[in-house]
Amino acid sequence: IGAPWPSSRKWLNRFKKYDYYNVVKNNMQKNRIGNGGFSLRSRKFLEFCSQFENCNGVPEDIFFCILNYEEAKKHKINFAPFELAYKFSSEHSFRKLTNKHPVSKSKFNFQNHFGWHGKRFLNSDKLMNLKYEN
């Protein structure tokens, strides 16, 4: 885990069948899961990554999860679906990622996301504006 250790097993149980999950900031065609601010990686995913000497200046989530997506699938890396990954962590608002409102009508709260860059803001109005920005 590359960020604060999860404090609740309820989150880990939701995601444990996937080797890597998180939302890539751009809408990619093959895979939209990357490192949007917080990511968990299985041992299998780390072993897959270790075959590469470096990322050649490409951000690691793009390098491993987009550019080498097909190779990862050959190594049986299991990426979480976008909808589940978004609930785990996101770097951008759902609207910005999908051009539509979230499926859930519930307002943003810290229980809905396990990790998110927006948590660095203390002002909840600022959070809401970032979460649902155009």
Model-derived regions: residue spans:
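Conserved donor-nucleotide/metal-binding helix-loop-beta segment in metal-dependent transferases, i.e.
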Residues: 1-28
